[in-house]
Amino acid sequence: LLIVMLLLSCLAGTLLISTNQNRNLVNQYVSETVELYVSQFQKEMDVMRVELINILESNEATNELPDYFNSESSQVFPILKKISEQLRIQAIWHDSVYGYYEYIGTSNALITSTGTKFSKSVKTSTERFLMVYLSANMTRRQNSLYHEFVKIEDQMYLLTWYMKGQKIAGNLIPLQRIFEDLENCTKGYTILPYIYD
């Protein structure tokens, strides 16, 4: 009976040590996975920054837009449609992005992947927020990139935008999506005991 008790206590000790070892390995793996995700997200943000700058600096369609146009300026409709399509494609490349947009301050026009909105257009709450917010920020420093946290209808976003002249290019990233991705990095790892020598 004493030998059985000793064997059971040795086995329990071995299981406890192996569980702790396994837990340490899982924690290390989760930590490294999260670090990798953050590193990838940072690289994606760097790519998006370059894309926003290129939209205003070297995009032919954006450069073809006149300084002022309105909802009755039919000559710019093909250009606006081309820009909308380019913004739609930009959003497809980045899973985390809610959407790309361009804002033309002189015309108070917001170009998104779904079309162009003017001051009297019917807009979603997000489009309405962007038009008001960006219009109010047109006096900020030119040729600059901005990152700001904004709240739109009970949801927090990372609003990134680049301004040149009276034009702004930017995107919205829901913070909830970032947090969900981080949380998913830590799920699915169970701790199974193994015999440790």
Describe the function of each predicted region.
Residues 6-14, 117-118, 125, 142-158:
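An N-terminal domain-start capping segment
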Residues 94-95, 186-189:
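A structural signal for short coil/turn segments at secondary-structure junctions
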Residues 89-91, 136-138, 159, 182-184:
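Short, flexible, glycine/charge-rich loop motifs used to bind or transfer phosphoryl groups or to couple energy/partner
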Residues 28-40, 44-133:
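Extracytoplasmic/periplasmic sensory segments of membrane signal-transduction proteins
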Residues 112, 120-131, 151-186:
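Conserved beta-strands of PAS-like sensory domains
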Residues 132-164, 190-197:
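Membrane-proximal, non-catalytic sensory/regulatory domains of signal-transducing membrane proteins
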Residues 1-24, 28:
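Extreme N-terminal signal-anchor transmembrane helix of membrane signaling/transducer proteins, especially
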Residues 101-103, 171, 194:
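Conserved hydrophobic/aromatic positions in well-ordered beta-strands
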